[in-house]
Amino acid sequence: MTRLEIVDSKLRQAKKTEEYFNAIRTNIQFSGKENKILAITSVREGEGKSTTSTSLALSLAQAGFKTLLIDADTRNSVMSGTFKATGTIKGLTNYLSGNADLGDIICETNVPRLMVVPSGKVPPNPTALLQNAYFNKMIEAIKNIFDYIIIDTPPIGLVVDAAIIASACDGFVLVTQAGRIKRNYVEKAKEQMEQSGSKFLGIILNKVNESVATYGDYGNYGKRDRKRK
């Protein structure tokens, strides 16, 4: 099995936000034992969903849960800057196109209990690949092997891929950058994801300006459909 090493700078970054993601992990655990397969998305690129996916997966693994992180943002993966391969690797697109077995794409890491499925090469038809039978077949094959499966998806505000992926998940989390995305776009993204039939677990407000906000501003994670003034 191919091994991936998480780069030191990313580990240090994750350490700085460890308490924050431990709190998010706890909220997810309290949301229900049935919520094991989670899609992570955002409205636009650059809001921090991939970092959130990785940090959440790390938190789960470090808490003792056997965790699989799937990089399903096959159009614009940034995880190659987080995990470095010790050899030639195959990824999700190789499997979905029928050019690799499932066992070929699940990689061990230098973090105990954390395994990763890389995205693979950028395909000419990302949406069509996700809609074929291989994706659901993969989820069925692995869902009882891992305690949690975290799937980093493309931004729902740009392409429909995230909703397709979410249809095979127990729930989804929406990551949004503070001060960047208007509320109506966030609401629309939430509605698009809910059309998949997946359960909305909450919004993570990311990249908050600490000069005008405190740790307490993250406390609404997991609260759904709150009444707004």
From Swiss-Prot:
Keywords carried by this UniProt record: ATP-binding, Capsule biogenesis/degradation, Exopolysaccharide synthesis, Kinase, Nucleotide-binding, Phosphoprotein, Transferase, Tyrosine-protein kinase
Coiled-coil blocks: none
Gene Ontology process terms (BP): capsule polysaccharide biosynthetic process
EC number: 2.7.10.2
Pfam families xrefs: AAA_31
Pathway in which this enzyme or protein is active: Capsule biogenesis; capsule polysaccharide biosynthesis
GO MF: ATP binding; non-membrane spanning protein tyrosine kinase activity
Entries under InterPro entries matching the protein: AAA_dom, Bact_polysacc_biosynth/exp, P-loop_NTPase, Wzc-like_C
Catalysed reactions, as listed in the record: L-tyrosyl-[protein] + ATP = O-phospho-L-tyrosyl-[protein] + ADP + H(+)
GO cellular component: plasma membrane
Organism superkingdom: Bacteria
Function: Involved in the regulation of capsular polysaccharide biosynthesis. Autophosphorylation of CpsD attenuates its activity and reduces the level of encapsulation. May be part of a complex that directs the coordinated polymerization and export to the cell surface of the capsular polysaccharide.
Family indicated by similarity: Belongs to the CpsD/CapB family.
The protein, known as: Tyrosine-protein kinase CpsD
Name of the gene this protein is made from: cpsD
